[in-house]
Amino acid sequence: MNNSKLTSVKILEDLYKRFKATTVNTKMTLQKLTNRSIDLYLMDENYKNTIETHDNLTASGSNL
């Protein structure tokens, strides 16, 4: 992937554990989910609104 950008983000530990458990026997990775989510966010107004209004996360001191 020559056109990729290395970055780091903080992810809620419980969400990450649940994601890993859910995807353990699939080909879905956090990188795939992130890239697809960003693409949908930029291309799909309904998805963007869903993400921007989602407030079902527990605050942990980071920008959720």
Show where each model-derived region lies.
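Short, positively charged interaction helices/loops
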Residues: 43-64
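Active-site micro-motifs of SAM-dependent methyltransferase domains
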Residues: 17, 40
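Short Lys/Arg-rich basic patches
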Residues: 1-11, 20-23, 28-31
